[in-house]
Amino acid sequence: MNKVIIYTKDICGYCDRAKNFFKSKNINYTEYNINKEPKKFNEMIKISNGMKTLPQIFINKMHIGGYDDLKSIINTGKFDKIIK
């Protein structure tokens, strides 16, 4: 079973788009909202090689990046291979 983790924040259009994409595919995900869980921000920076923008998306412990990165792997057909 795949595991998707999305680091988000309040009032973030790209975060909402990423979550809506996974919902539309019936893919469960764990969301860490840094406004509600500030300690998760430092964790995210550490495991994403210093990225501070949101969202940050991980699939099966693989760092995907932000929403534009997610769109890129979808458009190139890599998403289906990664999510399996």
Residue map of PLM features:
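Local sequence-structure signature of Cys/Sec-based thiol-disulfide redox active-site neighborhoods
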Residues: M1-T30
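Short alpha-helical
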Residues: G13, K36-K39, K52, G65
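Thiol-based oxidoreductase modules, predominantly thioredoxin-like and allied folds used
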Residues: Y29-F41
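Structural micro-motif
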Residues: N49-F58, D68
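Non-catalytic, surface beta->alpha helical segment in thiol-disulfide oxidoreductase systems
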Residues: I59-K84
